[in-house]
UniProtKB/Swiss-Prot annotation:
GO cellular component: cytoplasm
Entries under PROSITE patterns matching the protein: EPSP_SYNTHASE_1
Active site per database record: D297
UniProt-recorded Gene Ontology molecular function terms: 3-phosphoshikimate 1-carboxyvinyltransferase activity
Protein name, per record: 3-phosphoshikimate 1-carboxyvinyltransferase
Binding of phosphoenolpyruvate, residues: K26, G97, R125, Q172, R328, R375, K400
Catalytic activity field: 3-phosphoshikimate + phosphoenolpyruvate = 5-O-(1-carboxyvinyl)-3-phosphoshikimate + phosphate
Record GO biological process: amino acid biosynthetic process; aromatic amino acid family biosynthetic process; chorismate biosynthetic process
Phylogenetic placement of the source organism: Bacteria, Pseudomonadati, Pseudomonadota, Alphaproteobacteria, Hyphomicrobiales
Organism, scientific name: Rhizobium leguminosarum bv. trifolii (strain WSM2304)
Family statement: Belongs to the EPSP synthase family.
EC number: 2.5.1.19
Keyword Transport in record: no
Pathway annotation: Metabolic intermediate biosynthesis; chorismate biosynthesis; chorismate from D-erythrose 4-phosphate and phosphoenolpyruvate: step 6/7
Subunit: Monomer.
Amino acid sequence: MTRTAKLTIIPPGKPLSGRAMPPGSKSITNRALLLAGLAKGTSRLTGALKSDDTRYMADALRAMGVSIDEPDDTTFVVTGSGRLQPPKAPLFLGNAGTATRFLTAAAALVDGTVVVDGDEHMRKRPIGPLVEAMRTLGIDVTAETGCPPVTVKGTGRFQADRIRIDGGLSSQYVSALLMMAAGGDRPFDIELVGEDIGALGYIDLTTAAMKAFGAKVEKTSPVTWRVEPTGYRAADFIVEPDASAATYLWAAEVLTGGAIDLGVPSDAFSQPDARAYDMIARFPQLPAEIDGSQMQDAVPTLAVLAAFNETPVRFVGIANLRVKECDRIRALSSGLNRIRPGLAREEGDDLIVKSDPALVGKRLPAEIDSFADHRIAMSFALAGLKIDGITILDPDCVGKTFPAYWRTLAALGVTYQDKD
């Protein structure tokens, strides 16, 4: 399939109104897929996301002996034997961070060798802290560059009963270890250490999903979890809509003064990015400082929205954005300054958006490099709702988590000019 090279958003000039359902949560779908694959029996996942990231996870599980059927666009029927099998070839996971981190840890439960690999972007994303944590359990795991590819020689047995890991690193490392732990041979504790504990909400998502599949996991302190070696049992599981995807629709609503029905109230989400709703609702009076540490995937949405705010906004607690699909702090600063020089700047790992409500209605031709990052592409599309001339490069990258994004905006009244 030919990819669209660029897409120019035509400002609608009117409020966006209608019904627009966000897709299923990527974070929850990939957790549920792995847990269902580790379980013995047949699980049915409904409301699931079908996207690049979840297909990489599903295909990897198939390569490890799990049967996965897809009877419709939002359902996975997963049948596992209770133990993953060694794949015959390396697992290729593109640039799917959740799949890569989760399967690296899960590979320790395989009786054999598993190589976890990805594309050129994933090969630049760090995984060393997870590798080091696994080694403390006696697991034979190597990642020569500190990034994928990772080779895991699993046995399903651990030589320690406690892991201490820096809580300021990616929460995906912690989630990966937690999900692995229930399939091990002994109870053990996972403790976060350090001054900055980030994205605890995503760890809560993980433990909730684990419990739904029969695991016994207990939070014994604000930063410690104890996991019993229960394994997992098959379950029917409903995936809630994606809160990160919802942020684009909430922002489109306030930017255009529209009324968009997402089909689910903002307080129905359990995902941490739903916290952004209260911020978005304050537009154009966003706070002077926004801590993005507990809603990291919502920061690009908020940063672009901040460009139209009445006063400047500083984003803090976002250092981990530098090691996402791209350096999102740099990408946001670069893109905003393409729209108007001086609109944003980096200060250490903070992002400062100076804000300029006068941007609304102007023609400011700007090609925005998405850096093949779905969240950069979707966020800067919001700028195109109010500024004439915004062009997104590599718009098809939204297929990573929200394949219908451009169609969803079109159904609300947005039009485009594309160029292959």
